[in-house]
């Protein structure tokens, strides 16, 4: 089986894909049999992460011994060494990190391709593979990212905006009397108390940001663009958007699986020390 990890600034998502042996020592991959979302804790040790992984696998009835490959997308460089050690100590495997030099099958037309976060490339690969192009993937994470792929499968660029959670926390931290509130969709725009008014500002204001950016990106692309959203708040925001037609909670995990498949020959060489 294949273990995939998407390490974000706030959360880390793990998934396990079933695998069937194929010719030449490779595998074909099927459904996602288990996945989990945990907090990203930069101070945890290798053994603490090992215990966490064992507990998650036990909950999902997945055996450590059946994992034959690991691929990681990380936007938290200080954790990379720790995660590499976890993989080697607890799985006896060297993980494949999505980084320059890894085959993605997607040309990157960016001023400096190394600046593009691994998660953005992974999302773009999955969006194009699953939905076709041209397409835009929107990921609602700590930051909200919009990534554009051409009809030919080329990464063209995108937009990075503060996430809705950051915006809400900033308002709480910088004001004396406004409370923390849950992010939810109000029944109407006009609030009749402080909490409702804040929730309306967060939801409808952020929805305006999202749809405003998408409107302009679609216009720049000449229209007829597929748009897919992912990330923790994608169902909430996607439900109110005029432009988001598909919400795919597993987009990033599928992207990691696809990139792993495109690097199987390289990973076999690495595992055998060649």
Curated annotation (Swiss-Prot):
One of its GO terms (cellular component) is cytoplasm. Substrate binds at residues 110, 117-120, 194. It is an enzyme of class 2 (transferase). It comes from the Bacteria. It catalyses: (R)-pantothenate + ATP = (R)-4'-phosphopantothenate + ADP + H(+). Keywords: ATP-binding, Coenzyme A biosynthesis, Cytoplasm, Kinase, Metal-binding, Nucleotide-binding, Potassium, Transferase. K(+) binds at residue 139. ATP binds at residues 6-13, 142. Its main location: cytoplasm. A monovalent cation. Ammonium or potassium. The active site is at 119 (proton acceptor). Its cofactor is NH4(+); K(+). Belongs to the type III pantothenate kinase family. NCBIfam families: baf, PRK13318.1-6, PRK13321.1. This is Type III pantothenate kinase. It comes from Koribacter versatilis (strain Ellin345). The lineage of its organism: Bacteria, Pseudomonadati, Acidobacteriota, Terriglobia, Terriglobales.
């Amino acid at each position: 089986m294949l273990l995939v990890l998407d390490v974000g600034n706030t959360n880390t998502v793990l998934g396990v894909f079933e695998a069937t042996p194929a010719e030449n020592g490779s595998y074909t991959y099927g459904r996602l049999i288990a996945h989990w979302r945990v907090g990203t804790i930069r101070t945890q040790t290798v053994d603490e992460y090992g215990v966490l992984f064992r507990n998650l696998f036990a909950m999902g009835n997945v055996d450590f011994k059946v994992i034959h490959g690991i691929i990681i997308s990380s936007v938290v460089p200080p954790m990379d060494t720790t995660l590499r050690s976890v993989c080697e100590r607890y799985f006896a495997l060297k993980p494949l990190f999505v980084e320059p030099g890894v085959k993605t099958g997607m040309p990157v037309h960016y001023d400096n391709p190394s600046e593009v976060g691994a998660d953005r490339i992974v999302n773009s690969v999955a969006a194009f593979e699953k939905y076709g192009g041209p397409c835009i993937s929107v990921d609602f994470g700590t930051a909200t990212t919009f990534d554009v792929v051409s009809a030919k499968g080329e990464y063209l660029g995108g937009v990075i905006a503060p996430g809705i959670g950051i915006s809400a926390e900033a308002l709480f931290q910088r004001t004396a009397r406004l409370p923390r509130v849950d992010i939810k969709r109000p029944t109407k725009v006009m609030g009749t108390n402080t909490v409702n008014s804040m929730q309306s500002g967060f939801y409808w204001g952020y929805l305006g940001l999202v749809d405003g950016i998408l409107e302009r990106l679609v216009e720049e692309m000449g229209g007829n663009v597929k748009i897919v959203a992912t990330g923790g708040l994608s169902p909430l925001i996607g439900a109110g958007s005029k432009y988001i037609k598909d919400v795919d909670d597993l987009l990033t995990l599928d992207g990691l699986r696809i990139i792993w498949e495109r690097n199987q020959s390289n990973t076999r060489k690495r595992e055998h020390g060649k």
